[in-house]
Amino acid sequence: NRQMRVLLLFDKFSSTKQMLYNSFHDTTGGKADITIYLHNQQINLLEYYIDENLGKFDYYVITPHFPLDPETQKRVLKALRRIPNRKLIIMDNYLPELPGNYGAVYQDFENDAYYGLAMGVKKLKKVPKLNVVIELSSLYHTMISKAVSRFCEENEIPYEFYTQVTPQIVKPKEVYLILHGQFDMELIKLARAAKSQKLKPGRDFGIISYNESPMSEIVLDGLTTISVDFVQMGRLAAEMILDGKLFKQKCDFRMIHRNSF
């Protein structure tokens, strides 16, 4: 009963990818020999890794996060089509243009944020304003921003987008949705600006962060997040390999209520 050889091709390593990996690794329970490469959202690296490793692994598990321009996306589809469907599992992003019976466990960047915020709608309707801090370098910032705008407009919640936190935007009673990578500078700047005004998260103003992470429970006495369930995503991908049955499933996305909102 030999170990299955699995190539994990992640875009980058972060606290969320660590959760994904741990869940995948723990579920396989030693039945998979896992190799990890990072493509860094560079299409030429994806092409190179597939070239070098075709036929060497039983399964290829890939997070296809690449620039959304048509030229790059065409190359992504072409590269992924080289892997036999029965050996391919796509993670974290869904590619509707990619045909075939491969496996996929993913989040829906266009709609998930809307449903995540809807889980806190009663509270959000009472706040004077939702301030949304977007990360322009994120591949999906336009999709996520659209979902947030739609949510706010349908529920008549005043909102404004910012690309960074400045002390001037930090005000009592308002809520800040940080769409950045986990625990990066914007969250730190927000906490600092609040501290200098003696404002306490959860008591005087609210913070919601995008993407759950192991640190979320601890930071600011508990950070409220809207996030896909990365543990579920890793587990489902591993189960496909263990059972030898591939399927496509959107993972759960929810608001996890903690102290900060």
Where are these regions (language model features)?
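Short, polar loop motifs at secondary-structure junctions
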Residues: 90-96, 162-166, 210-215
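Short, well-ordered beta-strand segments
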Residues: 6-9, 131, 208
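Alpha-helical recognition/docking segments in bacterial nutrient-uptake
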Residues: 2-111, 115, 175-178, 182
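Flexible loop/turn connectors
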Residues: 172-175, 181-261
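Short, solvent-exposed amphipathic alpha-helices that sit
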Residues: 16-30, 112-119, 139-158, 189, ...
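Hydrophobic alpha-helical segments within soluble ligand-binding/sensing domains
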Residues: 92-131, 186, 211, 226-246
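An alpha-beta-alpha
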Residues: 111-153, 249-261
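Short beta-strand elements in bilobed, periplasmic/extracellular small-molecule ligand-binding domains
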Residues: 28-40, 129-134, 149-169, 174-177
